[in-house]
């Protein structure tokens, strides 16, 4: 059994920043993550994707952001329990006891849930024999964009992932078709502006008003993607790669059975300290829900700071926290 001050569930950017914030206040952390590596969705789904709304970074890849956050938290020696889920919660007086899928038991006074989308998987389009092409011609996540050099690509979807990856891959692909059932996209305004600008050059073709209908290929290699509009007009797009981006299926898994207030796979918290209905358990980042919630990494960073500062008095039995600027606190830790 391990004893610590705080258990953080999730090692994405918000969870890692919570480790740093806790360390600055002298609190030790153990981190549980179901993935084999630190970084959450940033590493598992889009390590090479650029992020543009992190302060002081005009752009930074998801992988670079995680590396920076790991380095920032490293001086406080967090203990990581990877490739295992938090499955069981018990409470003993003022302490929580968590058991993982690998029978690891951790005792702490505070739990911070920063689980992002929880256990996630792609929403797959209902296409016949799609599994024959998965992993060779059809991909739901991009870990290495260099494999798409010179390819003819169909990207399907209208949200941030579809638009952002269309823009990013246009630099290396031979041709990209972006297929969306509507004329309007739901991505960031600036991303849509960039998309339409590149489309004017002919590098990207916007195939709007169409949906995926069928696949054409043999020996697990795609040769064309068939799309159809509402009037049943058919187009055959010559392509050897299909990237469907229709969002993720979210599943809180065992966390949903912990007695927390859960709504639509999100954990409800107050909008002051991001504490759940169980005192001592907080939820931050994309997994948390409250009125006015904004799903941004920077919002999760602020939630981490608030929740960790509020948790201080619980960890140290009611001791008051006296505010200090990070310059002074960090120098004292070194």
From Swiss-Prot:
Broad class of enzyme this protein falls into: oxidoreductase
Cofactor: FAD
Manner of cofactor binding, per the entry note: Binds 1 FAD per subunit.
Source domain of life: Bacteria
Binding residue positions for FAD: 33, 41, 46, 86, 120, 286, 327
HAMAP family listed in its UniProt record: FENR2
Keyword field contains Flavoprotein: yes
Subunit and partners: Homodimer.
Catalytic activity entry: 2 reduced [2Fe-2S]-[ferredoxin] + NADP(+) + H(+) = 2 oxidized [2Fe-2S]-[ferredoxin] + NADPH
The EC number(s) this enzyme carries: 1.18.1.2
Keywords: FAD, Flavoprotein, NADP, Oxidoreductase
Xref: SUPFAM superfamilies: FAD/NAD(P)-binding domain
Name of the molecule in the record: Ferredoxin--NADP reductase
GO terms of molecular function: ferredoxin-NADP+ reductase activity; flavin adenine dinucleotide binding; NADP binding
Family: Belongs to the ferredoxin--NADP reductase type 2 family.
